[in-house]
Swiss-Prot record:
GO terms for molecular function: RNA binding. The keyword DNA repair does not apply. The gene is AEP2. One of its GO terms (cellular component) is mitochondrion. Belongs to the AEP2 family. GO terms for biological process: regulation of translation. Binds to the 5'UTR of the OLI1 mRNA. This is ATPase expression protein 2, mitochondrial.
């Protein structure tokens, strides 16, 4: 056990990789708390207890609490290794080794997340509140958590397990009236998780719990950016993936949801704008109050633009953009816009006005004023998706708008001497456009420059859906080659652009199938032409005989 007199700087240096320290720093930064330049030394336990009861802690208090409650007990390695029995020691072993998913599985299977059992851990000291906060923070930050927690308890969705953890957090960690920056950070993680899983009712419960202890006026006064963004998403329509849009070529069909094509996107059954009055209040505070001047960000502006777009207030979008992002304005943000902001502008105009012209004009202005702006795959994916949805297949058989977006994407990368990065979402959006317009050259460009450019990388691991899409591109190209009668090019493609011997054999078989179909069509067309010619000759001969009789 570290001695109490050990300085905090020594503790942090010895355990700079401690997860709890990262958690406390992230919590303080996300809530806008300022870190003092000179940290005071550790005081007595009575002073620390008084600090923990304050409604808002400074970063220094959070670090002090992290050291006292978590770092010192965690660093007593000899004591841990000698304690081999009892469930409490096993829980701490999981925490020490970073096995947060396994800990949840153990609690779920052995105790079914029993409330009395968790309460007992807090009472007996088997689990501290700081350790539980760390557990929540790291668990919800793990990738593919839904896959790891699938079927932990039969017929119990993993979101129910997470919601159970949230209920424990509210009952045992949070004070009845106030929220610390660390607690606000943890609750925001629950919010993000439930929104990502399309569990909007659960997300609303978390947000309402936060608003009871920190109302909207307090969020605006304290410039709580992250929570305000979640508020706009849940109550003001800023969740664009749940928006409904009517495809241009299917005006009489059911509207589709913007996010339904994404393989990793969970969709809610319903999504409604719940609060129209507060949006103007939020905009006035963000633009008018001095404490927001250095707290605004492209992410927050994107959420506000989505909210305005959901209401159809495209005129206000242009005014907001001119007010916040005009380089000539002193109050304008001094950072560059990002893809999230540009996607918000484009989506809002396209979905509510039904055309991309105005949205593209605003985007051109952004790119002209901010030449260093980065357009990531998310931007190009949404650009192609919107162009496909607005494509009227009867009036525009060549998909001029979609191919124009594809050309702009290639030009943007070429001007910066970059290769087009591989992105499954982009390739998936392009495939039906190429097939419908029979654009073999575009598909060949995707195969040769994007797909195989990524697959040859040693660290790249192809997924089943990516492999399936690649095979679709290959078969489409071979079909178009076969139907044009270019047999040599077909076998050359199979030889050069197959990724395995099995794939090569399948491509050759597929090519021969369509080659046979093409030959049958040619033979059938030749017979039809011969029959028509014969019929014409007979008619001409009859006319000549009739002429002689006359």
């Amino acid at each position: 056990m570290l001695r109490t007199a050990c300085s905090r700087s020594h503790v942090f240096k010895a355990f700079s990789s401690s997860l709890m320290l990262e958690h406390a720093l992230a919590a303080a930064n996300s809530s806008g708390a300022a870190a003092p330049t000179n940290a005071a030394s550790t005081g007595n336990s009575h002073d620390s207890t008084l600090k923990s009861e304050l409604p808002l802690r400074t970063l220094n208090d959070e670090l002090h609490n992290a050291e006292r409650k978590y770092i010192k007990p965690l660093t007593n390695a000899p004591e841990w290794s000698s304690t081999r029995t009892g469930p409490n020691s096993k829980i701490r072993e999981y925490l020490k080794n970073g096995q947060y998913t396994k800990l949840l599985i153990r609690l779920s299977v052995d105790n079914h997340l029993n409330n009395e059992y968790i309460s007992g851990l807090f009472t007996t000291g088997g689990l501290t509140k700081s350790e539980y906060s760390l557990f929540i923070n790291k668990l919800l930050s793990e990738e593919e958590l839904d896959v790891k927690l699938s079927n932990v308890i039969p017929d119990t969705p993993h979101t129910e397990l997470i919601y159970k953890l949230y209920e424990f957090y509210c009952d045992h960690i949070v004070d009845q009236h106030n929220l610390t920056p660390l607690q606000l950070y943890d609750l925001n993680l629950f919010l993000k998780t439930f929104i990502a899983e399309a569990q909007l009712s659960k997300a609303h419960n978390v947000l309402d719990f936060i608003l009871l202890r920190r109302p909207l006026n307090d969020l605006l006064a304290n410039t709580d950016v992250e929570i305000l963004i979640q508020f706009l998403r849940l109550k003001c329509g800023a969740l664009s993936k749940f928006w409904k849009i009517q495809p241009a070529s299917q005006r009489n069909s059911t509207a589709i949801t913007l996010g339904e094509k994404a393989s990793d996107c969970h969709l809610a059954k319903s999504y409604k704008f719940q609060n129209e009055k507060v949006l103007l209040q939020i905009i006035n505070s963000v633009l008018g109050e001095h404490n927001w001047k250095n707290r605004r960000s492209p992410k927050l502006d994107a959420a506000i633009i989505y909210s305005l777009g959901y209401l159809g207030q495209t005129d206000l979008i242009e005014k907001y953009v001119n007010r916040t992002w005009s380089p000539s304005k002193d109050e304008g943000v001094k950072t560059n816009p990002n893809s999230d902001l540009l996607v918000a502008v484009l989506t809002s105009y396209c979905v509510k006005e039904g055309n991309m012209r105005k949205g593209l004009e605003v985007l051109d202005r952004f790119i002209r004023d901010y030449p260093e702006v980065e357009l990531d795959p998310l931007f190009w994916r949404r650009l192609l998706q919107l162009s496909s949805l607005l494509w009227d297949k009867k009036r525009d058989r060549k998909a001029t708008l979609s191919h124009g977006c594809w050309t702009i994407m290639k030009q943007w990368h070429a001007q910066r001497q970059r290769k087009i990065p591989y992105d499954y979402g982009i390739m998936k959006e392009l495939y039906p456009i190429f097939v419908r317009t029979k654009n073999k050259n575009g598909a060949l460009e995707v195969i040769t420059k994007s797909f195989f450019g990524a697959f040859i990388q040693p660290e790249f691991t192809i997924r089943p859906n990516e492999l399936s899409l690649l095979c679709k591109y290959q078969r489409f190209i071979l079909k178009m080659i076969a139907l044009k009668g270019n047999y040599h090019k077909g076998f050359e493609f199979c030889q050069e652009w197959s990724f395995s011997s099995t794939n090569k054999f399948e491509l050759q078989s597929y090519f021969m199938k369509w080659r046979g179909i093409h030959e049958q069509r040619r033979t059938s067309q030749s017979k039809q032409k011969a029959a028509l010619q014969e019929k014409y000759d007979e008619m001409e001969e009859d006319d000549m005989l009739l002429g002689r009789l006359w």
